[in-house]
Every structure is written in structure tokens, then in C-alpha cells.
Amino acid sequence: MQVGFFILMFIIGAIFGSFLCCQARRLRRREEKKKPLGSRSVCPHCGYRLKWYDNLPIISWFMLGGKCRKCRHKIGALEILSELATALSFALLSTTINLETAAPLDYAIFAITLLLTLSLTFLAIYDGAYGELPTLCLTFSAICAIILVILKQWTLFSIDGFSFNLFLPPVLSASLLGGLYLVLYLISKGKWVGNGDWLLAGIIGLALFSPWLSLIALFLANFSATLIMYPFVRGKNKKSKKIHFGPFLVLAFVLSLTFSD
């Protein structure tokens, strides 16, 4: 059962990844006050309206060689990276719940975690593509993180009653991860990390619930960013030393949450 659930979540994640990538492009066009793409997916280069078999997550991209079926212009890597990232995130998170022993509260926590992951993935896609983090999506992610904290403490609420001490670990976690990126932002005056990065880090820290997990996420985010971005930063044609940390923070969130047990 668990293996089947893993595969199912991978497929669902790939579908959502394709959807999130499309929505990121639509939002960008609205912000730039360009003509909207419409309700149907089209090639951004020739305007070819994609058929249903052109929209199969992951499969279509590889079958077409990452190119438009009509004009053969390269589609780019954003689509396939979005689909693979969301698919793998959902598949990994499926291992955090045991379908045979899970209680209703466990399913609620799992559902909110998936919703938060979708919101964070959208932020990662948008930040990676355009270097910005939409305020509305940041706010929605923060709300999901708060709900997740409440659900995780629900059992303790019913046993011990309300206490501010119950919120101390997630608050410390958010302050630690968000605070460190805020310091980097202030020291560099926005040259190293963006204004939204420390907010995103704080939200992720809150959702991780533990200061120790925040430290692990901090290491994973910075290590992966250094590993991937170092060749670009060292290159002669570099435009900026500023790194978009959004994708790396979200990657660290999923990995930390998955292997926390």
C-alpha cells in the first residue's frame, strides 16, 4: 500500500508542478501588464495551442526533447524542473505518514503540509525564474505554517490546556532561520539575499517546528546553493553575486521534514 501511495503522490505532484509553472508565468504577465495567456496553454514563442498530449507532466517534455511541437523552439528547463521537483517533494512527503496507523489528525497535518509545500514550491519557481517572491503567496504560506503548528500541538492543547510554552519551539525555529537570513540581508544591504528570502526562511522555520531542524535546513540550503551556483558566481560573465535562495530553502524544507524522523 505504501509503495502505491508513493507512486500516486509522485504523479499528483508532477501534475501540480505543471500547473504551478503555468500559473507563475500567468502571474508574471499580469504584473508586466502584458496580454494574458488565456485559459489554454500555448507556446510562448509561436503561440501554438498545446494539445492534451503535449501537456502530460514530465513525459511530454522528454518526448518532445524540450521543444515546441510546431516551431521546435526550446521550451526551457523551468517546466521540467518544476514538475520533477513537485513530484519528488510529494513522493518524499508521502513517506512521513503511515496509512495503516494514521489517525484523522495525522491526515490533517499531512494535508496542510502538502498545501504548504505547493505554496512554497510556487514561491521557489517564481523566485528562480524572476527573482521575486509574491507577497500574497508568502502570506498564504505563513497562514499554512501557523495552522500546521496548531495541528501539531492539538493533542497537547487537549491534555494540558493552552500555554504559550507550547509555541516556544516553533517561534525559536522561525526566529533562528529567518533571523540569520535577515542579518545577511541587512549586512549586504540586499546584495547577497533578497528582502523576501528572510521572510520565506522564517515561514519555513516555523513549519519545521524545531530549532534543530532549522539548523539542518540552513546547512542544506546554503550547501546546495553553493554547490549549484558557485560556477555561475565565479564565471566571467556573471551579472550579480546575488543568489535567489527561494528554491534552495524550499528544497531544504522538504528534505528536513522528510528525514526528521
Place the predicted regions along the sequence by residue:
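A membrane-topology feature that recognizes alpha-helical transmembrane segments
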Residues: 1-261
